[in-house]
Amino acid sequence: MLKGKTALVTGSTSGIGLGLAKALAREGANIVLNGFGDVEGPKAELQALGVKVVYHGADMSKPSEIEAMMTFAAAQFGRVDVLVNNAGIQHVARLEDFPPEKWDAVIAINLSSAFHATRLALPAMKAANWGRIINVASVHGLVASPEKSAYVAAKHGLVGLTKVVALENATTGVTCNAICPGWVLTPLVQKQVDARALAGKISNDEATRQLLGEKEPSMQFTTPEELGELAVFFCSPAANNVRGVAWNMDGGWAAQ
């Protein structure tokens, strides 16, 4: 379905981003990877799916590096057809104790980076009259939790940005939608489970049950693969008129 097209996925060397990149690659999209840590492993996994893969290590908190990444992607493949704004970080603290520099970092990476990348991707998408912008928000783009002020503010902002971009391009072949996951078992979340087990002197299974039981009625993690299938749907002809949606895949979290 996406053969000959290019997908740029920010924060895609592991976790949700890598799952999304794999799903798009299985549909034939060439991939621009971005992120930190191991690059060669994810790159090889994607290349094994028969697509071209390149990497750019832009720091998503820096607009100049985002611009360099978008220029690089265009030089490699002509244009970005599918932009997935997935890069994100977290910091947890009560508001009065929240370090201002952490607030700025979360807003820069979780929200502003999507603005910068989208602004730069749109002209070529509009010229081609086809494009898909997929913002990875969170259930925290719909609801809130204590001690996550910056994250919740950024993800609510990302949902708002999604709607504006969708409306501004509603008569074109460019769509913009958001994915709002609940708990996803990524290496980052596994660390939270491990820490909870250690602190409570309980098993990892019990720590997992506690984590899910607090928020997610299904008592199941969403998987990166499931999120990837939703991204593929957004790219399909069936989703041509799906515009400005914040689609939660959260096991019933936001329904409560």
Question: How should each PLM-predicted stretch be described?
Answer:
Residues 138:
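Residue(s) in the substrate-gating loop at a strand-loop-helix junction
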Residues 3, 143, 232, 243-256:
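Short C-terminal tail/terminal secondary-structure segment
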Residues 6, 13-15:
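Conserved glycine-rich cofactor-binding loop
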Residues 94-95, 102-107, 133, 212:
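Substrate-binding pocket helix/loop in short-chain dehydrogenase/reductase
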Residues 118, 154, 162:
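Active-site helix of classical SDR
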Residues 27-42:
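Conserved glycine-rich Rossmann-like NAD(P)H-binding loop of the short-chain dehydrogenase/reductase
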Residues 170, 175, 242-244:
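Short, small/polar-rich loop/turn modules that mediate ligand/substrate recognition or access, typified
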